[in-house]
Amino acid sequence: MYAVIVTGGKQHKVTEGEFLKVEKLDIATGEAIDFDRVLLVANGDDVKIGLPVVEGAKVTAEVVSHGRHDKVRIIKFRRRKHHMKRQGHRQWFTEIKITGIQA
């Protein structure tokens, strides 16, 4: 059984027991969270597609940890001017474990 959920402006295909890194959520480590925006639920040949969400479907998860991704390097360069600006960015994430899918 799997589902497609929306969180942080992105769509994620999830299965029960899976660990997933999503955009940072303001929830303490160890707490449970429910995702109500479920776009699709599939159990074998039984597929439910929402318009836009599946009514009554819910995905539950547990917050495992918070952290930051690897650094992304940004270089702004102006040709012929000997000008370079280097910058880096590390995006925050929340790691969750999917504990249940209810449809």
Swiss-Prot record:
GO process terms (BP): translation
Record carries keyword Cell division: no
One Gene Ontology term of the molecular function aspect: structural constituent of ribosome
The keyword RNA-binding belongs to this UniProt entry's keyword annotation: yes
Keywords: Ribonucleoprotein, Ribosomal protein, RNA-binding, rRNA-binding
PROSITE patterns: RIBOSOMAL_L21
One GO location term (cellular component): cytoplasm
Reported function: This protein binds to 23S rRNA in the presence of protein L20.
HAMAP family recorded: Ribosomal_bL21
Family stated for the protein in its record: Belongs to the bacterial ribosomal protein bL21 family.
Subunit structure: Part of the 50S ribosomal subunit. Contacts protein L20.
Protein known as: Large ribosomal subunit protein bL21
Annotated source species: Pseudomonas paraeruginosa (strain DSM 24068 / PA7)
Gene that produces this protein: rplU
